[in-house]
Amino acid sequence: MTISYTLDVSQTNLQSFFSLLLRWRGSVWKAVFGQLAVWTAVFLLISCIYRYMLSPSQQDVFEQLIRYFDNKLDANIPLTFLLGFFVSFVVARWGSILNGIGWIDDASLLFATYIRGADEETRVIRRNLVRYLVLSQALVLRDISMQVRKRFPTMDTLAASGLMTHEEMDILDHIKDPYSRYWTSIQWSLNLVYECQKKGKVDSYYLMNKIVDEIGKFRHGLASLLKYDWVPVPLVYPQVIFLAVRIYFMICLIGRQFIVTGPNPSGIDLWLPITTMVQFLVYMGWMKVAEALLNPLGEDDDDLECNYIIDKNLITGLSIVDTMWKHDDTGYSMVEEHMAKTPAQKKDEFWGIDKIAPLYSMESAERSVHPLVGSASKINLVKNKKEIVMTPHKNKLSELDPSEQKTYLRRVNVSDHNAKHAKQRGLERANSPDKCLSKMRSRSNGKFRTSANGSQNGVDLWTRAGDIEMNVATSNPNQVHPHSIAVFPPEEQQTTSRH
């Protein structure tokens, strides 16, 4: 099950930090707590034996072991270096596996758009194309994911679930391919597309090739999943990492003991090695990241939702091909006509507007936005000049005679540029974003009474906003989107117009 915590980290504050930290499922606490408890118990057991059961001479020998094991331990086993490379490699591999699990939306949209026809035969073809792709995905995933294998333990369960018919299962059983049969349903899909083109349901070979390419892209993703399952990370690599981390903390069981006797005792005797326990939490948790991501198709908390992907692809794909299509002559192909009907084409709300101002709620409008504007675009380098002189570079001037040099000399008047720049800067200072928003808030605060259908005092807000703007728009060529004008109760409209 994939653990979602995105909403918890939507803001960088202490509340988000604690919301993230206090989770249990999929957390570092769940992954490490049991091993940390065992390690701490063994550490305390060794400490008790050292303190109370060993003779003074044995304690001297044990203290020599403590110094020996703790000497240059971090340098001899560089866990940060080892884990950094390994986890980066595993995360990149995990991302490729995630991208290989295909969504059927693109292919379904092409089926619905390019395979024309509202008759039952065409509808069956479009739906079967979706089903064949989902069947291919299920066949692949049930061989590489325990989630899907438990859901479909036999081929009969695939037929019982509706992903294939018993006739199709018989065909699969009689295919003489000792390696795989994943390609079979893909081949059925390609054959159906070709038959549709021959029957005129697909208008051209170009459109047929577009559909074929999309099916091929879906198949390529499934093939990449099989390759990642077939060729895992070389066994030596995870063995070295996992063994190094555990050996490190086995050595720490002795090397991090507090020396309580002898000429050089530890400066402080805490019994529990707090810093080493923090190291255990960090390094072991870091290693658990790699362990969880080595096979993201398993059954851990953070593994991918393979069964959900199959369900989503089947339901969404069938919905797309069977509801979002319209025939030119005979009407709509689905009972849910309102879903298949293309909306009437009307002018959008921003028609004829020079300055478009998309709307925000008052709360979200307070958030500053960093626009895509060059960092040097607002700098005026000719502020105190009337003109600038343009000339070739000195390296080129040396190649020209004096008469040719004069022909390249240009004088550029920058007075208009400076005037426009000064005007723009003045407008920005007079109409700062915070000041304008504050004015809008003071005008509208406590004045709205909005009904459930989006109207205010029984009047549609959109219509009233357009009515208020009419007089302003006719006198100002640089129109502002009418919806950006505040809507006020009738008693304030006259006052508002003066602003």
UniProtKB/Swiss-Prot annotation:
Family, as annotated: Belongs to the anion channel-forming bestrophin (TC 1.A.46) family. Calcium-sensitive chloride channel subfamily.
Keyword ATP-binding among UniProt keywords: no
Pfam family, one: Bestrophin
Gene Ontology molecular function, alphabetical: chloride channel activity
Role, per record: Forms chloride channels.
Quaternary assembly: Forms oligomers.
Bias (Basic and acidic residues) ranges: 417-432
CC annotations in GO: chloride channel complex; plasma membrane
Mode of membrane association: Multi-pass membrane protein
Membrane-crossing residue ranges in chain numbering: 29-49, 77-97, 235-255, 267-287
Keywords: Cell membrane, Chloride, Chloride channel, Ion channel, Ion transport, Membrane, Transmembrane, Transmembrane helix, Transport
Main location per the UniProt record: membrane
Record region (Disordered): 417-455, 474-499
UniProt keyword Zinc-finger, yes or no: no
Cellular localization per UniProt: Cell membrane
Top-rank taxon, per record: Eukaryota
InterPro entries given in the database record: Bestrophin, Bestrophin-like
Protein name from the UniProt record: Bestrophin homolog 22
